Amino acid sequence: FGAIAARYDLVNDIQSLGLHRVWKRRVVSLANFSEGETGLDLCCGTGDIAIGLAKRGGALVGMDLNRPMLQQAAARLAKRGGQCVRLAQADALNLPLGNHSLDLVTIGYGLRNLGSMEDGLREITRVLKPGGRLLILDFGKPANRLLRSAYYLYLAWILPVFGWLCCGNASAYAYILDSLKKYPAQKGVAAKLDLLSYKSVQIIDIMGGTMSIHVAIKQ
């Protein structure tokens, strides 16, 4: 991701026709983040979700393992006056945060990329307070077979072309399909959250299930 950080947002705008910003704004809206709360935008990338949450008034930390991505986020936050956001480089599998310390965790397009999704979810659960909210935005697997086939073809052939044209790096986007095939997606992620004793897990399908949002409340 470091090699494509400078043009990461451009490629996302092109490949989704700008819709990724709409989906992230929906995450921000669903998060119900408010003044007096403490939140974490995990795998924050260039800061889209963090910027949106910062406007809600709570104290927010944006964490990512990739320094070039954090540098892009810092530049964007500086332009937008994101005083309520503190950025930190950290591993999602070993969060430098105390137990039960957060009201909210969001993770956009990051869970699928963790070295161990199960360990990542356990860490998120550890730092969330009882009653805390977890929102996950990521690629999904459409239930409709025809749509899924067309979607996979797009990810296999079209998306890497955008990556090559905009960043000179097709491989950074070609991996998405491979990672998605291994990702449990909508029902699989919900099942893992159920095992971690979240009392409420909602799945919101977007664009026929090509994307999805999970909203979970910790017991």
Place the predicted regions along the sequence by residue.
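Conserved alpha-helix/loop element of class I SAM-dependent methyltransferases that forms part
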Residues: 7, 16-37
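A short acidic, Gly/Pro-enriched loop at the edge of an enzyme's catalytic core
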Residues: 93-104
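Class I SAM-dependent methyltransferase SAM/SAH-binding core
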Residues: 38-94
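Conserved beta-strand signature within the Rossmann-like core of class I S-adenosyl-L-methionine
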Residues: 132-139
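C-terminal alpha-helical "lid/dimerization" subdomain adjacent to the S-adenosyl-L-methionine
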Residues: 140-192, 196, 202
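Hydrophobic beta-strand segment of the Class I
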Residues: 8, 105-106
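Core SAM-dependent methyltransferase catalytic element
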Residues: 190, 196-219
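A short glycine-rich, Lys/Arg-flanked "PGG" loop and its adjoining helix->strand segment in the class I
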Residues: 118-130
